[in-house]
Swiss-Prot record:
UniProt-listed Gene3D superfamilies: Nucleic acid-binding proteins
GO MF annotation list: rRNA binding; structural constituent of ribosome
Full protein name: Small ribosomal subunit protein uS17
Keyword rRNA-binding among UniProt keywords: yes
Gene behind the chain: rpsQ
Subunit field text: Part of the 30S ribosomal subunit.
Membership in a protein family: Belongs to the universal ribosomal protein uS17 family.
Summary of the function given for this chain in its UniProt record: One of the primary rRNA binding proteins, it binds specifically to the 5'-end of 16S ribosomal RNA.
Gene Ontology terms: cellular component: cytosolic small ribosomal subunit
InterPro entries assigned to the protein according to its UniProt record, in alphabetical order: NA-bd_OB-fold, Ribosomal_uS17, Ribosomal_uS17_bact/chlr, Ribosomal_uS17_CS
Length: 87
């Protein structure tokens, strides 16, 4: 069980929940440009397994690296950090 602490954990925003038991999460990271020093924003789209379909579009979630669950799914939902505000 202590082995799971070594897996990568990312925090991002849910941009799609149209698939059954799968969510798409955008993770934004910042990296300093090597020559100019400006911080550049990079984003990655990850597909994550959501067993109970609890995450909705706009939620801030934590996802953890896991074994391959399908051709594109390599992460699973750990927790919903902040729910989206419905207007």
């Amino acid at each position: 069980m202590s082995e799971r602490n070594q897996r990568k954990v990312y925090q991002g925003r849910v941009v799609s929940d149209k698939m059954d038991k799968t969510i798409t999460v955008v993770v934004e990271t910042y990296k300093k440009h090597s020559l100019y020093g400006k911080r550049v924003r990079y984003s990655k789209k990850l597909k994550a397994h959501d067993e109970n379909n609890q995450a909705k579009i706009g939620d801030i979630v934590k996802v953890m690296e896991t074994r391959p669950l399908s051709a594109t799914k390599r992460f699973r939902l750990v927790e919903v950090v902040e729910e989206a505000v419905i207007i």
